[in-house]
């Protein structure tokens, strides 16, 4: 009787529960031998008189447990059959530990709040995706796209994304920015229209080469959508030479040249100048700088084919982009002809970025890359090149991107008196830890970047943990570069011991290049009304916890 009753209960339980429930499995083992009432464990001792009573108790327990587990399985199946539906706004509102941390993957919604502290890459990395999709971050870190990671994530599923939110909303045709490309959600946006954004510090120095999706973006106008098949680059010929109209295929016929170059916006770290006195410009933090491997035709080769040669008199190569405002005014800039014609300067008409065609935000199909020179001269969506006796008359060459004395204000400024920024000064910044965060005592890792314009190599980065009283030399990482052709940054790192009794750290970094240029210690003496050339010692204040 009892064995038959047990078997009927066990068969009635869901197969998955019978296999996975440890308590139930032990009960099954205790009652499924040929002598079903024979004790299977020393603690289970039945006398002949009460064995039947005890057996019924075991069966009662089994029946109750089976009912509970069967009901739980029913609820799980019902939940799977009818998942809760959440809107994109629901997910977006859960973007911190107080509200809960929700993310999406495909059509599924997950509450990963309890996993944040367990994330192998650290809490800060996972929080970058809080309130949004995981796909852009998994694209950066392919290690996530593994079956066991998806199985782990499945434990945190809470529902499905509303089907209406799985499609991008329609764009207004009259909006000049309606055709802008999609951007990576990790980017910190400083301006939506035109789009300007920087990668967060914790991602910026994760790798020597900045992944294309998180390369800082500096746009002045709407992003043009150019057809590579009909694209033409117009190069004005020299007197007696021949003007060129080059297709993308024509550019590919020139010898391909590759070079690793760091681009930095003139306004990088402008936010620190704004704390001293208000400036005009985007609130760039430390991320208006990135590094890529660029490939394309050398500008000197293209100019030579158009009949251009070095001149004894001053001359400038002027660039005009295909991005324009409603009046038809395009972005423009220029560099000295001497730099453009020097093969060692490695100026490119680039059509590849990190082995891929240029992304639209970064100048597709062709942009200028001028190693060692401020990002403002790296004209994107290049449409026209000419050689002139004077620099470009573009607003961004003549009336912007110039440095001034701290005494100059908007009532006294004269842009004609200041030269246009070309090469940038020595620069460094701390990317880990971030200002206002906490670190644990013991070994602390300090990370950052350093770079200098004009091909000058970074030879040293000094780091202080106590506000400048004492200094330690950081370890430099990155490619070895030729003298006077150090076009790319150095990533640096310092491992420092912090005693348990330490309460706070005032971390500072400063870099030195091979001309022994060093960063100024404070912002005030280099303040200027446009907030450019901000390269004072970078300072980070953190609390220490045991």
From Swiss-Prot:
Region (Hinge): 166-175
Amino-acid positions noted as binding heme b in the UniProt annotation, renumbered to this chain: 119, 144, 146, 148
Pathway(s) where this gene product acts: Energy metabolism; sulfur metabolism
UniProt region (Moco domain), positions on chain: 176-402
Stretches the record annotates as Homodimerization: 403-539
Record-level GO BP terms: response to nutrient; sulfur compound metabolic process
PROSITE patterns: CYTOCHROME_B5_1, CYTOCHROME_B5_2, MOLYBDOPTERIN_EUK
Root EC class: oxidoreductase
Amino-acid positions noted as binding Mo-molybdopterin in the UniProt annotation, renumbered to this chain: 216-220, 265, 323, 362, 367, 378-380
Cellular localisation: Mitochondrion intermembrane space
Transit peptide: 1-80
Function summary: Catalyzes the oxidation of sulfite to sulfate, the terminal reaction in the oxidative degradation of sulfur-containing amino acids.
Known cofactor(s): heme b; Mo-molybdopterin
Modified residues (Phosphoserine): 124
CDD domains in the cross-refs: eukary_SO_Moco
Catalytic activity: sulfite + O2 + H2O = sulfate + H2O2
Gene Ontology CC entries for this record: mitochondrial intermembrane space; mitochondrion
Cofactor: how and how many bound: Binds 1 heme b (iron(II)-protoporphyrin IX) group non-covalently per subunit. Binds 1 Mo-molybdopterin (Mo-MPT) cofactor per subunit.
Assigned keywords, A-Z: Heme, Iron, Metal-binding, Mitochondrion, Molybdenum, Oxidoreductase, Phosphoprotein, Transit peptide
Name of the featured protein: Sulfite oxidase, mitochondrial
A single MF term (Gene Ontology): molybdenum ion binding
Quaternary organization: Homodimer.
The enzyme's E.C. designation: 1.8.3.1
Residues covered by the Cytochrome b5 heme-binding domain: 83-162
Classification via PANTHER family: SULFITE OXIDASE, MITOCHONDRIAL (PTHR19372:SF7), SULFITE REDUCTASE (PTHR19372)
């Amino acid at each position: 009787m009892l064995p038959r009753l047990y078997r009927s209960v066990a068969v009635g339980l869901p197969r998955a529960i019978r296999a996975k429930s440890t308590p139930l499995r032990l009960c099954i083992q205790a009652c499924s031998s040929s002598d079903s009432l024979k004790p299977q464990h020393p603690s289970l001792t039945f006398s002949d008189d009460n064995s039947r009573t005890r057996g019924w108790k075991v069966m009662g327990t089994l029946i109750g447990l089976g009912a509970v587990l069967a009901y739980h399985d029913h609820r799980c199946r019902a939940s799977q059959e009818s998942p809760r539906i959440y809107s994109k706004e629901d997910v977006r509102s859960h973007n911190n530990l107080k509200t809960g941390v929700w993310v999406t993957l495909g059509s599924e919604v997950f509450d990963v709040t309890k996993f944040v502290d367990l994330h192998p890459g650290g809490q800060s990395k996972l929080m970058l995706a809080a309130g949004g999709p995981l796909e852009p971050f998994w694209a950066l870190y392919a290690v996530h796209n593994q079956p066991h990671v998806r199985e782990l994530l499945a434990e945190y599923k809470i529902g499905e994304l509303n089907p209406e939110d799985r499609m991008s909303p329609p764009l207004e045709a009259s909006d000049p920015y309606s055709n802008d490309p999609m951007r990576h959600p990790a980017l910190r946006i400083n301006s939506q229209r035109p789009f300007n954004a920087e990668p967060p510090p914790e991602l910026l120095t994760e790798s020597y080469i900045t992944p294309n999706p998180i390369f800082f973006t500096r746009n002045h106008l709407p992003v043009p959508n150019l057809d590579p098949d009909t694209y033409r680059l117009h190069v004005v010929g020299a007197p007696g030479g021949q003007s060129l109209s080059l297709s993308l295929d024509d550019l590919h016929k020139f010898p391909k040249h590759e070079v690793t170059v760091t681009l930095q916006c003139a306004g990088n770290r402008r936010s620190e100048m704004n704390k001293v006195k208000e400036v005009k410009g985007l609130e760039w933090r430390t991320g208006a700088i990135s590094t890529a491997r660029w490939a394309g035709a050398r500008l000197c080769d293209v100019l030579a084919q158009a009949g251009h040669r070095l001149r004894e008199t001053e001359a400038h190569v002027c660039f005009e982009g295909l991005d324009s405002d409603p009046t038809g005014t395009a972005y423009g800039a220029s560099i000295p002809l001497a730099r453009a014609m020097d093969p060692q300067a490695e100026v490119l008409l680039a059509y590849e970025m990190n082995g891929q065609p240029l992304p639209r935000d970064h100048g597709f199909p062709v942009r200028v890359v001028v190693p060692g020179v401020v990002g403002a001269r790296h004209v994107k969506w290049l449409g026209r090149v000419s050689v002139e006796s004077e620099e470009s008359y573009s607003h961004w060459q003549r009336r912007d991107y110039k440095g001034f004395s701290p005494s100059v204000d908007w009532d006294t400024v004269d842009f004609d008196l200041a030269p246009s920024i070309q090469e940038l000064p020595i620069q460094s910044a701390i990317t880990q830890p971030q200002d206002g965060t906490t670190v644990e005592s013991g070994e602390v890792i300090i990370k950052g970047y350093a770079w200098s314009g004009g091909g000058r190599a970074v030879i040293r980065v000094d780091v202080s943990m106590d506000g400048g009283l004492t200094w330690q030399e950081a370890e430099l990482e990155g490619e070895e570069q030729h003298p006077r052709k150090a076009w790319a940054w150095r990533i640096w790192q310092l491992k420092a011991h912090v005693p348990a009794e330490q309460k706070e750290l005032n971390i500072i970094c400063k870099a030195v290049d091979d001309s022994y240029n060093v960063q100024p210690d404070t912002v005030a003496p280099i303040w200027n009304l446009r907030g450019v050339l901000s390269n004072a010692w970078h300072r980070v204040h953190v609390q220490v916890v045991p």
